[in-house]
UniProtKB/Swiss-Prot annotation:
This is Glutamyl-tRNA(Gln) amidotransferase subunit A. It comes from Nitrosomonas europaea (strain ATCC 19718 / CIP 103999 / KCTC 2705 / NBRC 14298). The gene is gatA. SUPFAM superfamilies: Amidase signature (AS) enzymes. Keywords: ATP-binding, Ligase, Nucleotide-binding, Protein biosynthesis. Heterotrimer of A, B and C subunits. Disulfide bonds: none annotated. One of its GO terms (molecular function) is ATP binding. Belongs to the amidase family. GatA subfamily. It catalyses: L-glutamyl-tRNA(Gln) + L-glutamine + ATP + H2O = L-glutaminyl-tRNA(Gln) + L-glutamate + ADP + phosphate + H(+). The active site is at residues 76, 151, 175. InterPro entries: Amidase, Amidase_CS, Amidase_dom, AS_sf, GatA. Its EC number is 6.3.5.7. Allows the formation of correctly charged Gln-tRNA(Gln) through the transamidation of misacylated Glu-tRNA(Gln) in organisms which lack glutaminyl-tRNA synthetase. The reaction takes place in the presence of glutamine and ATP through an activated gamma-phospho-Glu-tRNA(Gln).
Length: 486
């Protein structure tokens, strides 16, 4: 059951060959056994999870089930869930129990899914390695010495180690796709505005987007069918006709024009990653796809642009955490200003403080025009590069990350090297485009490599179809980490 797809689990549940209670108990037992080492989950609540499973079993018995009813899911700890500790990986929210559900959580609850727990993450989603969490680093299940990627490292680890059949993630500059690649699973960041951000704790509001993480593209399609939809509580939510992301999965891909940006295949990519990506592209050639060289000339500016805009928005968003209404509050203070200063100094970690300082600096008088406005102009140029590229191709492909997972602690003292982990993913984020990563093989030290697929706006169904066809002729997505398979 641990390796079953969501469709297979759905069939077993609907045919009453297993109950949701049995399935949930099996995953909870596995979490208990493996989580002390992997640290993928911050919070588990067996009683709550089993209560939800019991409700799901009743839904199935009454004939009121959906394709996802009874299936457990892990929620990234950035999503508010009523009655659950919701920490965002920070000391600042270490005692915060959410009084309401995020729309994403609410939609999965209504579909009858079971919340297995809240997964570990980089503090306030700021990080590329899941090392900035107040709750300690997450280990990569393929190699316990390696990082799982970030910021959705707990979710990626949970799916890869079969602690959960699916998980939610959030992506600001690559936080779904990068950990999906480094942990050998599938993950998709939809077009900005497709998935509601209501109840998803904000990092950079013009970039943040929730999305699913699972073993395969087919699983992602099933999850997106529930996740996507207009929400009037989110002012950036898009109102579009409902789409079924599973209906075109089997379409042939012959004649598909795949764009290969020359900038993505230049220096910076390690040879082991390059070899895996070349082999993946060869599979698409066999499937009948054609390749077109395209150019994204401003992509080299994506990381500096991202690290001006995202911290600027973060410095504003995180100003709400001051110890007054909720969250951590310093024990001793002499005035209101002292309360603010000590609470934020003690409650935020080093990386979060660094980004707040950068953001405050680029928004300050005298630097706003030089940094923030310039970055906004360059962001538009990056989006324009993609517009021109998509006139020549249907999809864009390349590596998700320049290297395989690095070792825990390797880049902690070098923020610039850490930030460059987002070099391929931040471009799509800045343009608001959908991007996904699927497992494509293994590089050095037998660590996973991800293939990055970028689609035009609202082309998630096409991306999932293209990924699914690849997964029908390869088995990378079915492999399990050796130390966690039993």
């Amino acid at each position: 059951m641990l390796n079953a797809s969501l469709r297979q689990l759905s069939l077993l549940l609907s045919e009453k060959k297993i109950s949701s209670t049995e399935l949930t108990s099996e995953f909870l037992s596995r979490i208990k056994a493996l989580n002390p080492d992997l640290n993928a989950f911050i919070t588990i609540d067996e009683e709550k999870s089993l209560d939800q499973a019991n409700v799901a079993d009743k839904m199935i018995a009454a004939g009121r089930s959906t394709p996802l009813t009874g299936i457990p899911i892990a929620q990234k700890d950035i999503f508010c869930a009523r009655g659950w500790l919701t920490t965002c990986g920070s000391k600042m929210l270490s005692n915060f129990v959410s009084p309401y559900d995020a729309t994403v959580v609410e939609r999965f609850d209504q579909a009858g899914m079971v919340n297995l727990g809240k997964t570990n993450m980089d503090e306030f989603a700021m990080g590329s390695s899941n090392e900035t969490s107040y709750y300690g680093p997450v280990k990569n299940p393929w190699d316990r010495l390696a990082v799982p990627g970030g910021s959705s490292g707990g979710s990626a680890c949970a799916v890869a180690a079969r602690l959960a059949p699916a998980a939610t993630g959030s992506d600001t500059g690559g936080s779904i796709r990068q950990p999906a690649a480094l942990c050998g699973i599938s993950g998709i960041k939809p077009t900005y505005g497709l998935v509601s951000r209501y109840g998803m704790i904000a990092f950079a509001s013009s970039l943040d987007q929730g999305g699913p993480m699972a073993k395969s593209a087919e699983d992602l399609a099933l999850l997106l069918n529930t996740m996507v939809g207009f929400d009037e509580r989110d002012s950036t939510s898009l109102q579009r006709a409902e789409e079924n992301y599973t209906q075109d999965l089997e379409k042939p891909v012959n004649g598909l024009r795949i764009g290969l940006p020359k900038e993505f295949f230049a220096e910076g990519m390690s040879s082991d990653v390059s070899n895996v990506i070349e082999a993946a592209l060869a599979e698409y050639r066999k499937l009948g796809a054609t390749f077109v060289e395209v150019s994204l000339p401003n992509s080299k500016l994506a990381v500096p642009v991202y690290y001006v805009l995202a911290p600027a928005e973060a410095s504003s968003n995180l100003s709400r955490f001051d110890g007054v209404r909720y969250g951590y509050r310093t024990a001793q203070y002499s005035s209101l200003e002292d309360l603010y200063t000590k609470t934020r100094a003690e409650g935020f970690g080093e990386e979060v403080k660094r980004r707040i300082l950068i953001g405050t600096y680029v928004l300050s008088h005298g630097y706003y025009d030089a940094y923030y406005l310039q970055a906004q102009k360059l962001r538009r140029l990056i989006a324009e590069d993609f517009r021109k590229a998509f006139e020549q191709c249907d999809l864009i492909m390349g590596p998700t990350t320049p290297t395989v997972a690095f070792n825990i602690g390797e880049k902690c003292d070098d923020p610039i090297q850490m930030y460059l982990s987002d070099i391929y993913t931040s471009t799509a984020s800045l343009a608001g485009l959908p991007g996904m990563s699927i497992p494509a093989g293994f590089g050095s030290k037998n660590r996973p490599v991800g293939l990055h697929i970028i689609g035009n706006y609202f082309r998630e169904a096409q991306m999932l179809n293209v990924a699914h066809r690849y997964q029908q002729v390869t088995n990378w997505h079915e492999l399990t980490p050796p130390e966690t398979s039993n």
